[in-house]
Amino acid sequence: MALSREETARRYGTAIFDFAKDSGKTELMYSELTELKKAVQAEPRFVQVLSNPVLDAKQKKSLLTAVEQGFSAELQEVLNFLLSYDRFDNLVDIIDYYIHLYNAANHIGTGVAKTALKPDEDQLQRLADSYAKKYGLQALHLENEVDPEIIGGVVLEVEGRVIDGSVKHRLEKIRAMLTK
């Protein structure tokens, strides 16, 4: 029975996290996997090639060897492990699960800040720091989505929690009170 993408990501992501923890390299692995994820997303053909059943293991290994230079021995071992089990088609999902485990272990939140206009990095960081402090997180990594329909303010979606401080939401509340 084939594993689902989610189950594959969970199993391999957990195994990689445990391996990194046992070797005392969780931060290094996090950093390198994050870098690798960005590279793979910028060049998705990399995963497609290493997942291609037409290429034999030796060809895939030589391609991987060329790419893994500059990464730690631990990450190289992980990449070779994934290659040997033919799991490169799940690479981004596996990395995402590792990041999820790392963030949970280190009390780091992730979320989205929806704003009407794009904030500068400093504004976004101040918002993240404020939220992290209020909710007991060590850090918060926020992505920004611009949504002109919220008119102004910000809608924060963090770890399943939504805080709607948008002008649109406030106007809807006023409208609801007036129509009662």
Swiss-Prot record:
Q: Where in the cell is it found?
A: Cell membrane
Membrane topology per the entry is: Peripheral membrane protein
Q: Which UniProt keywords apply?
A: ATP synthesis, Cell membrane, CF(1), Hydrogen ion transport, Ion transport, Membrane, Transport
Q: Recorded GO terms, molecular function? A: proton-transporting ATP synthase activity, rotational mechanism
Against Pfam families, the record matches this protein to: OSCP (PF00213)
Q: Name the predominant localization.
A: membrane
Q: Specify the signal sequence span.
A: none
| InterPro entries associated with the record | ATP_synth_OSCP/delta_N_sf, ATPase_OSCP/d_CS, ATPase_OSCP/dsu
Q: Which domain of life is it from?
A: Bacteria
GO annotations of cellular component type = plasma membrane; proton-transporting ATP synthase complex
Task: Tell me which PANTHER family the record gives.
Answer: ATP SYNTHASE DELTA CHAIN
Q: Which family does it belong to?
A: Belongs to the ATPase delta chain family.
Subunit-level organization? F-type ATPases have 2 components, F(1) - the catalytic core - and F(0) - the membrane proton channel. F(1) has five subunits: alpha(3), beta(3), gamma(1), delta(1), epsilon(1). F(0) has three main subunits: a(1), b(2) and c(10-14). The alpha and beta chains form an alternating ring which encloses part of the gamma chain. F(1) is attached to F(0) by a central stalk formed by the gamma and epsilon chains, while a peripheral stalk is formed by the delta and b chains.
Name the job this protein performs: F(1)F(0) ATP synthase produces ATP from ADP in the presence of a proton or sodium gradient. F-type ATPases consist of two structural domains, F(1) containing the extramembraneous catalytic core and F(0) containing the membrane proton channel, linked together by a central stalk and a peripheral stalk. During catalysis, ATP synthesis in the catalytic domain of F(1) is coupled via a rotary mechanism of the central stalk subunits to proton translocation.
Q: What is this protein called?
A: ATP synthase subunit delta
Supply the source organism for this entry. Lactobacillus delbrueckii subsp. bulgaricus (strain ATCC BAA-365 / Lb-18)
**Underlying gene:** atpH
